[in-house]
Design a protein with these regions (language model features):
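Short, charged, surface-exposed hinge/linker loops at domain edges
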Residues: 1-5, 9, 35-70
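Short aromatic-glycine-(Arg/Gly/Cys) micro-motifs in beta-strand/loop hairpins
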Residues: 4, 9-23
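Short histidine-centered beta-strand/loop micro-motifs
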Residues: 19, 29-30, 56
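Flexible, active-site-adjacent loop/turn segments at secondary-structure boundaries
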Residues: 22-25, 46
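A short, exposed loop/beta-hairpin motif centered on an aromatic-Gly-Thr core
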Residues: 24-33
Length: 70
């Protein structure tokens, strides 16, 4: 089966890590970063079985600074 590289964007919420695949829109979570990515991989593969993507473009990821008041 052919494979494709996707992006995982992670952030921590309390005691869980949330992982999102921006190319597909799938989201999953885990107690560790590794578990969150493994769960995201599984969710993405299951999603793509039902809804194949015609083509996937890599997202542009940028970091920016913003003023925070409070």
């Amino acid at each position: 089966m052919p494979t494709q590289v996707f992006t995982a964007v992670l952030h921590q919420e309390e005691d869980l890590y949330v992982a999102e695949c921006p190319e597909v829109g799938t989201v999953s979570q885990g107690k560790t970063i590794e578990e969150a990515i493994a769960n995201l991989k599984e969710a993405t593969e299951l999603y793509l079985q039902e809804f194949p993507l015609p083509s996937v473009s890599r997202p542009i990821v940028a970091v920016f600074e913003a003023a925070v008041h409070g």
